[in-house]
């Protein structure tokens, strides 16, 4: 009886050994056929290939991080925005050449597009002017390669050196809770005054400001916006009249640059920012806005700014911003 049981156990052991061996042999093929889990590998935006040498750049989209928050008047932490955006972009990471599939509409967008992450600009804390020169130089190189720049901030002061790199006529579409036309820094560049400088750039022909709200926009900032001739559409007006109120304010343009401050969104949706205001635009409102902007002209660049992960451990601010970015690009390309 013991011999029979021993023989059966031996046969079972042999079968298990064979099965394990087959699994081991199959693992390389299985692994090669699968997308790696999101927790595997070096973090790049959407797991795009990493290409830090801008002289070798050859892509449709180049993602550039600007980890700078020396221009903020609110809670610092935006310097970690690029890292947070890259981390939370892993939720959407896959083979980017396959594009993005929308189940609503049963459609695939941005298929065949080549993305690269070119890393971060080397910033110099407490030396904003030198940092600004580095930002402008990097964006100029991207543009020279006929590649679309996607800039990850950073506080909103980085938008000035980014736009300074362009030499084509631009309409700047500024989505924000704040006008950013305040001159309280006595002429110095910061995240609340960058519009004053952008308006003086030769390439900038029109500035449209969308989503402003709350009690942090003082009469001086409002007066400066009027003096500059910017077109302002508040969040209240968008709530009341619909997204068409914002789209109608954007003129037909040869080229459009979008700067997206995440504090334009309702803080219940996007708490991860340094200077949020109660209220704000809903996801549906901003998403429709993003989808409609390219109907007014050629999209030539964009930035996502004021992401502060210290105020949003959940990461939903960054993930929402990424989704809105994809929807904007899908509408444009």
Q: Where on the chain are the PLM-derived regions?
A:
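Bacterial N-terminal signal peptides
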Residues: 17-28
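Bacterial N-terminal signal peptides that target proteins for export
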Residues: 5-18
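Boundary at the C-terminal end of the N-terminal hydrophobic targeting segment
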Residues: 29-33
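Conserved alpha-helical scaffold segments that buttress catalytic/binding sites
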Residues: 35-333
């Amino acid at each position: 009886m013991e011999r029979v049981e021993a023989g059966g156990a031996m046969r079972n052991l042999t079968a298990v050994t064979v099965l394990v061996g087959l699994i081991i042999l199959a693992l390389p093929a299985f692994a090669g056929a699968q997308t790696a889990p999101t927790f595997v590998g070096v973090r790049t935006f959407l797991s795009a290939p990493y290409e830090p040498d801008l002289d070798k750049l050859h892509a449709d989209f180049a993602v550039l991080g600007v980890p700078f928050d020396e221009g903020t008047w609110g809670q610092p932490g935006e310097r970690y925005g690029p890292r947070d955006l890259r981390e939370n972009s892993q939720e959407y990471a896959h083979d980017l050449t396959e594009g993005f599939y929308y189940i609503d509409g049963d459609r695939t967008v941005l298929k065949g597009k080549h993305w690269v992450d070119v890393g971060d600009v080397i910033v110099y804390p407490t030396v904003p002017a030198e940092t600004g020169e580095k930002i402008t130089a990097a964006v100029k190189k991207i543009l020279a390669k006929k590649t679309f720049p996607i800039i990850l901030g950073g506080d909103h002061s980085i938008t000035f050196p980014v736009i300074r790199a362009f030499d084509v006529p631009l309409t700047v579409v500024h989505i924000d809770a704040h006008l950013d036309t305040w001159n309280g820094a006595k002429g110095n560049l910061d995240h609340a005054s960058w519009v004053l400088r952008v308006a003086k750039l030769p390439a900038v022909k029109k500035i449209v400001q969308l989503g402003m709200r709350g009690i942090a926009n003082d009469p001086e900032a409002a007066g400066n916006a009027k003096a500059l001739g910017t077109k302002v559409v508040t969040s209240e007006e968008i709530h009341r009249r619909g997204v068409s109120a914002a789209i109608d304010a954007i003129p037909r343009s040869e080229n459009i640059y979008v700067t997206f401050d995440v504090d334009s969104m309702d803080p219940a949706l996007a708490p991860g920012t340094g200077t949020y205001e109660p209220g704000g635009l809903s996801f549906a409102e901003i998403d429709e806005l993003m989808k409609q902007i390219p109907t007014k002209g050629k999209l030539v660049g964009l930035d996502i700014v004021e992401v502060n992960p210290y105020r949003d451990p959940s990461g939903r601010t960054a993930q929402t911003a990424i989704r809105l970015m994809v929807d904007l690009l899908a509408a444009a390309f």
